[in-house]
Amino acid sequence: MNDIFTFAGLIDHSHDFIIGFHAVLTALIALFLAKMATRSLQVVPGALQNVFEALLDGILMMARDVIGEEKARKYLPLTGTIAILVFFSNAIGIIPGFESPTSSLNYTLTLALIVFVYYNFEGIRTHGFIKYFAHFAGPVKALAPLLFPIEIISHCSRVISLSFRLFGNIKGDDMFLLVMLMLAPWIAPLPAFVILTFMAFLQAFIFMILTYVFLAGAVLAEEEAGH
């Protein structure tokens, strides 16, 4: 979004500064709300605790089908943090005067690299270095020289697909909102705000569930190879 539409643009006209400012801001908002929700846990939850419990229960419910109950809970701190952070990073750009950190390819690429490094680390830690990379070659040894480089390229391309999918969608949403605010009064874009909020949630969900899918492929690699 053009600098004139961001409060941070009044302080510094560097786009990197604006993205960094909003990245820190969204992280602080997410951390503050999480602290508030868990500050005094109750049997009968308050509104904020109820929202976070519903969110985490929803993540676990969907993740069970992907990776199983035990591992879904094991990786919940990572995936839950990613889901919440990505949602706030997407949604903050809907507010006039703010810009989505996820509208920057550098930011989404950083998130994708974190996921890429982590799921490969977990795969190596679970199966060992040799066994983990051996499954890239497939069950047929004769095809290993062909399949191994293809699998390596396929895994590396996940960084590109994860980062560009999120970046492209949120950048497009920001451009759409910018045009709406330039052409229509403040009240007219209200339906667009609702749609963009849903899109912010949807993109956070997709990023989160793909993280679980990649983790499942890494830590369950030996089981998949056996079928």
From Swiss-Prot:
Protein's UniProt keywords contain Cell inner membrane: yes
Keyword entries, A-Z: ATP synthesis, Cell inner membrane, Cell membrane, CF(0), Hydrogen ion transport, Ion transport, Membrane, Transmembrane, Transmembrane helix, Transport
Localisation: Cell inner membrane
UniProt GO MF annotations: proton-transporting ATP synthase activity, rotational mechanism
Transmembrane region(s): 17-37, 78-98, 104-124, 176-196, 200-220
GO biological process: proton motive force-driven plasma membrane ATP synthesis
Name of one Pfam family that matches: ATP-synt_A
GO cellular component: plasma membrane; proton-transporting ATP synthase complex
Location (main, coarse): membrane
Topological relation to the membrane, as annotated: Multi-pass membrane protein
InterPro entries, A to Z: ATP_syn_F0_a_bact/chloroplast, ATP_synth_F0_asu, ATP_synth_F0_asu_AS, F0_ATP_A_sf
Family: Belongs to the ATPase A chain family.
HAMAP family according to UniProt: ATP_synth_a_bact
Function of the protein: Key component of the proton channel; it plays a direct role in the translocation of protons across the membrane.
Assembly behavior: F-type ATPases have 2 components, CF(1) - the catalytic core - and CF(0) - the membrane proton channel. CF(1) has five subunits: alpha(3), beta(3), gamma(1), delta(1), epsilon(1). CF(0) has three main subunits: a(1), b(2) and c(9-12). The alpha and beta chains form an alternating ring which encloses part of the gamma chain. CF(1) is attached to CF(0) by a central stalk formed by the gamma and epsilon chains, while a peripheral stalk is formed by the delta and b chains.
Full protein name: ATP synthase subunit a
